[in-house]
């Protein structure tokens, strides 16, 4: 069944239960069920907002109801359930905004991936200088590509920037000419 963001989350849960009740010969052997929240509300209203909390509570009820229904199935003990998220969130504070333009000339980079982490692709002659400057920037930690700690599970992928910059929790890091987007 194709993804449809307009289908309520509870209806999606009901669909999964219905599929699990199909005869074995037609029952799906892999079911993936996606809920795009609380990502959207967390980005719009901040992770600490009452709107985000309300959404998390709503999703928790749906998952609770789903597992209560699933436990009633004869095949429950044969099912492996994996519940995961694509990332976490933290509220950032305007006083912790770090504009990389205050430290580095943007034209010294071939490409910049703004995000958490920030991945920088400096021009070959600028890597060492950029690294040295970033080591002195408050509320951020920088690693060279070959020094990224294993806990981040980035390996040695060629798409990873030469510099991996991670802001402290509560810090917003960007390479933008304008002020903090709060």
Language-model segments: which ranges?
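Acidic/histidine-rich catalytic neighborhood
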Residues: 78, 85-125
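Short, solvent-exposed loop/turn and secondary-structure capping segments
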Residues: 43-46, 93-96, 176-178
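Active-site neighborhoods of enzymes that stabilize oxyanions during catalysis
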Residues: 111-182
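A long, amphipathic alpha-helix that forms part
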Residues: 9-21, 38-79
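Structural motif
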Residues: 30-34, 82
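Active-site-proximal alpha/beta segments of enzymes that process anionic O-linked groups
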Residues: 1-25, 145-146
